[in-house]
Each structure stands twice: as C-alpha cells, then as structure tokens.
Amino acid sequence: MLSTLIRRLSRALLWFVAGSIVLVLVFRWVPPPGTALMVERKVQSWVNGEPIDLQRDWEPWENISDELKVAVIAGEDQKFASHWGFDLPAIQAALAHNERGGNIRGASTLTQQVAKNLFLWSGRSWFRKGLEAWFTALIELFWSKERILEVYLNSAEWGKGVFGAQAAARYHFGVDASRLSRQQAAQLAAVLPSPIKWSASRPSAYVASRAGWIRRQMSQLGGPSYLMQLDSSRKL
C-alpha cells in the first residue's frame, strides 16, 4: 500500500514538473490568454454578487511606453536587470522587518510577481511560496528579461477588472499604452502595491508623493536607456 502511494505521488510529481516546464516554455512565445489572478478576481466578483467584466488587451513589447517599463522597474524591482528572480538582501530585510511586528513587508521581484499572478492563487502558505519559487526559477531560466517584463506589464492589475498596460492606459488616462507620459507612467507604477485601493488617475496625496519618488528613481536609473541592460542574450 505504501509503495503504491509513493509510486503514484512520484508519478504525479513528474507530471507536474514536466507540465510546468512545457507551460513556461509555451508562454515564452505565446501570450498567456489569462492569469490565475484574473480567474480569482472573476470568481470573487461572482461570489460577492457583483460580477465584473475584465478589461485586458495584450500589447507587444514595442507597443508599450518605455516610460512605463522603467517606472515599474523603479517602483517595484530596481535590481531586475541583474538578479535571477530573487533579491536575497531584500528578502532578508523583509523577514527581519516582519519579525519585529507591524505591517507585513513583501520583497517579491517582478519575476516572482509574474509567477504568482500567472500560475498561482493568493495566499502566504509555505506550499504556495514553494510553488512560486519553482515557477520563478523556470521563468528566469527560459525567458528573457524583456519577456518577463512584457508579460508582467500585460498581466498586472491596475484597477477593478483592469489588467495590463493597455487597459490601464485607456481606463485611467484615455490613451494607448504606447503614448503614456513619464508622469502617467509613474502614477500607474505608484499604485501597484494596492491597485484596488488606490487610483492612478485620481491620486491620493500618498500616491502623488510615491509617483514623485518613482520619477526621481527613474532619472537615477538613467531613464529609458536603462532598458538596454535587459540582456536577452543570456537566456537559453
């Protein structure tokens, strides 16, 4: 009985490993049709009796404002070009902060956020964190940095039912994602920690202050020229 159970578990694990690798490889080239977060939001809206229509239009890398690309990096993950999916010093600092009490601080890189939003459910269990680490490693192994950021920008939540840069640009500013200004990009990046609570088009004092900080960080990073550091040639 025990040996049979072990064989079945081993077989299931092998299928999971193989399936997840294939899925990540497919999404290296094919735009994901949706994300786990989008499904979760849709289900939540049904449960709450307030169904929502999801807004999302996939835009390729070249059709997204460079200002938004840099703004997201400046606000969310300034070591994006150099790390391999995990910012260990930031993780250690977050753990130390959380142990001292107070508000829980995260340290997720853009790659980790892609893994979580694309494949996983919300939560803080160690099991989910383990799956997040697995998918993060696969994404970093098989995708270029440009591809990671492209998928992130097309999957990020920017309001109730609003997903991706194009839908966000249209919803908040009435423009295409390719025409976002630096200020608009900074405001979109400023709400990413809590896009349902905060609005990019109607910024609170906090969001306005954070957007100003992000603009300064964008300048320190070198502006759009920073994107030249996203070395796609290091990928398989």
UniProtKB/Swiss-Prot annotation:
Origin: domain of life: Bacteria
InterPro entries, sorted: Glyco_trans_51, Lysozyme-like_dom_sf, PBP_transglycosylase, Pep_trsgly
Record's subcellular location: Cell inner membrane
A GO CC annotation given for this chain: plasma membrane
EC number: 2.4.99.28
GO biological process: cell wall organization; peptidoglycan biosynthetic process; regulation of cell shape
Pathway given in the UniProt record: Cell wall biogenesis; peptidoglycan biosynthesis
Membrane topology category: Single-pass membrane protein
Enzyme class: transferase
Gene3D superfamilies in the record: Biosynthetic peptidoglycan transglycosylase-like (1.10.3810.10)
Major subcellular site: membrane
Catalytic activity, as annotated: [GlcNAc-(1->4)-Mur2Ac(oyl-L-Ala-gamma-D-Glu-L-Lys-D-Ala-D-Ala)](n)-di-trans,octa-cis-undecaprenyl diphosphate + beta-D-GlcNAc-(1->4)-Mur2Ac(oyl-L-Ala-gamma-D-Glu-L-Lys-D-Ala-D-Ala)-di-trans,octa-cis-undecaprenyl diphosphate = [GlcNAc-(1->4)-Mur2Ac(oyl-L-Ala-gamma-D-Glu-L-Lys-D-Ala-D-Ala)](n+1)-di-trans,octa-cis-undecaprenyl diphosphate + di-trans,octa-cis-undecaprenyl diphosphate + H(+)
Keywords associated with the record: Cell inner membrane, Cell membrane, Cell shape, Cell wall biogenesis/degradation, Glycosyltransferase, Membrane, Peptidoglycan synthesis, Transferase, Transmembrane, Transmembrane helix
Gene Ontology molecular function: any one: pentosyltransferase activity
Keyword Membrane: yes
Transmembrane regions: 12-31
NCBIfam families linked: mono_pep_trsgly
Function field: Peptidoglycan polymerase that catalyzes glycan chain elongation from lipid-linked precursors.
Family: Belongs to the glycosyltransferase 51 family.
Descriptive protein name: Biosynthetic peptidoglycan transglycosylase
Native species: Pseudomonas putida (strain ATCC 47054 / DSM 6125 / CFBP 8728 / NCIMB 11950 / KT2440)
Gene designation: mtgA
